């Protein structure tokens, strides 16, 4: 009963915040005003708070532009998490437009929709992503092309990395920076989340969106770690397959280390640089002391 009361309250609060911010965002998109880039970040921070997503950030977002972020994909929650951390736009499948709730949110965030089955439109879509990169927008790409179980990185597809190549001629420095990042669901209710419980956070796609959303609302208190890795410079001499291989290697390493409780810096014997969007969350060391 208490869980359903929480679901209802969270839903009402999120609707109220949306009714305030959405008309402003629509106006900013229509008039091409600067707040269109950062307003979604505030909405997503509220959404993460209400859903019980506690986000910790490790490392730093690369300050150089153009910047393409390449991340592993576990769930629709990844969108909320990354959007609460930085002012980003996403590359999404065209059918996301028709999703309840999230389709509208994707359009309001000015996502780039691609039709992967329509090969003849691929060039136009890649050029659109390249133009957005050249305009200074931070574009997020999920190169796996689907969601995983949260325990591993699936094979990544190289085709959309062509967006980096298309933005190279428009870059003032002739370089596009491709930064890997890993999204790891590591805790639930303050306790470490093992492989067995990670499906609570993951959305593999064979479960309906609305039932999974309600399940997350009932559960709450999920801990998420976002690790930013070292960027790869993509210039006119770069090999797309080699860049995608290197990016995949770095994402896989960060994800594996985080799920095993090791940070990249700790593995190198360096202090771990971490900033938290939720300062009340215990550190990895504190949680390990609390764990049975």
Swiss-Prot record:
Pfam families: Acyltransferase. InterPro entries: Plipid/glycerol_acylTrfase. It is a single-pass membrane protein. GO terms for molecular function: acyltransferase activity. It is found in: Membrane. CDD domains: LPLAT_AGPAT-like. GO terms for biological process: lipid metabolic process. Pathway: Lipid metabolism. This is Lyso-ornithine lipid O-acyltransferase. It comes from Rhizobium meliloti (strain 1021).
